[in-house]
Swiss-Prot record:
This is Dihydroorotate dehydrogenase (quinone). HAMAP family: DHO_dh_type2. One of its GO terms (cellular component) is cytoplasm. Substrate binds at K65, N110, R111, M112, G113, F114, N170, N175, N243, T244. Monomer. The active site is at S173.
Length: 364
């Protein structure tokens, strides 16, 4: 069924404006039949952040910003779904056009600007689907016009703790002016201290909801040293590596679109984000698991991310070019690799290549 859907939908959606195509895809998923997915190979099961994942392949934040279709995505075979980014108040985001396909590069540039319907609407949707279970994380951010951005994160932690499987503290989007400044050492330490304190305040009523930190791939290694040190000292439960990049490789072929302002994702981000996964893994020293994201478009790419240090992986941009059937393809490739190498679980290879990757020349 998924293959047939991709065969029909991908060519049609490619003719539409990228944002209109995305909106149509969300509407289509809301109509997806309630068919249970095929059971995952038991070897793909992963335990991380105190949660049990049936497989390691998740969909990254940005696809289902407003929690409109998390259950359809789970039925398509994702091991987990991350909704958002959600802000306390609704906001329209940046003016259109703000989403661009770089088709020859299998990449996307976006400058969306945290457009979302706000915490109240997303909370209502998550409450309505809570009975169905599944791992649904909530990616949280600050409103562009907020007078106290840290207070925005705290409010969202307190609001969503009863319903979120985990939180992602997003301080790495390049499309909200000044947001990435929260990755600087003093600001990040204050933010994480207040976020973890908020989580502890609601623990009795909401449980121990894991808190993850999502970082940019454009950090220097010195900045990464500080970020990982603070994340460890504040006892975050994990990190997501990495968000979109502001850099533009000279190898990009879409020479006009490559100059659009915004964050670049997709295949050109793969080498940089994988290097950052490995660098983070080495610095974390097993203190917490990582989710690797950036340019994953095949089972081989997912395996490379895992061997670099990712316990779980996420994808989004590749769906634009490969379709929803990519999820099952990646899982099949991972299961086949475990069978071929006589391994019982992916945990046996997490970070196996990190020392080698961190010794390589920096990717351009």
């Amino acid at each position: 069924m998924i293959r047939a859907f991709d065969a029909v939908s991908l060519p049609l959606l490619r003719w539409l404006d990228p944002e209109d195509a995305h909106r149509l895809a969300i509407q289509g998923l809301k109509l997806w039949p309630p068919v249970k997915p095929r059971p995952d190979d038991s070897k793909l099961a992963v335990r991380a952040f105190g949660l049990n994942f049936s497989n390691p392949v998740g969909i990254a934040a940005g696809f289902d910003k407003n929690a409109e279709a998390p259950d359809a995505l789970l039925r398509l075979g994702f091991g987990f779904v991350e909704v958002g980014t959600v802000t306390p108040k609704p906001q329209a985001g940046n003016p259109r056009p703000r989403l661009f396909r770089l088709e020859r590069d299998e990449a996307v540039i976006n400058r969306m600007g945290f457009n979302n319907e706000g915490a109240e609407v997303v909370l209502r949707r998550l409450a309505a689907r809570a009975q169905y279970g599944g791992i649904v994380g909530v990616n949280v951010g600050a409103n562009k016009d907020s007078d106290d951005r840290v207070a925005d994160y705290v409010k969202l932690i307190e609001t969503f703790a009863p319903l979120a499987s985990y939180f992602t503290v997003n301080v790495s989007s390049p499309n909200t002016p000044g947001l990435r400044n929260l990755q600087q050492a003093a600001a990040l330490d204050d933010l994480l201290a207040r976020v973890i304190d908020a989580r502890e305040r609601v623990r009795a009523a909401a449980g121990d909801t894991p808190v993850l930190l999502k970082i940019a791939p454009d950090l220097s290694l010195g900045e990464l040293d500080d970020v990982v040190h603070i994340a460890r000292s504040r006892r975050v439960d994990g990190m997501i590596v990495a968000n979109t990049t502001l850099s533009r490789s000279p190898t990009l072929r879409e020479r006009t679109k490559m100059n659009e302002q915004g964050g670049l994702s997709g295949r050109p981000l793969f080498r940089l984000s994988t290097r950052m996964v490995a660098e983070t893994f080495v610095r974390a020293e097993g203190a917490f698991p990582l989710i690797g994201v950036g340019g994953i478009d095949s089972g081989g790419a997912a395996l490379t991310k895992i061997r670099a240090g990712a316990t779980l992986v996420q994808l989004y941009s590749a769906l634009v070019y490969k379709g929803l059937g990519l999820v099952e393809s990646i899982k099949a490739d991972l299961a086949s690799t475990l069978l071929r190498t006589d391994r019982d679980s992916l945990a046996e290879i997490v970070g196996a290549d990190a020392p080698m990757i961190t010794a390589e020349e920096w990717p351009v």
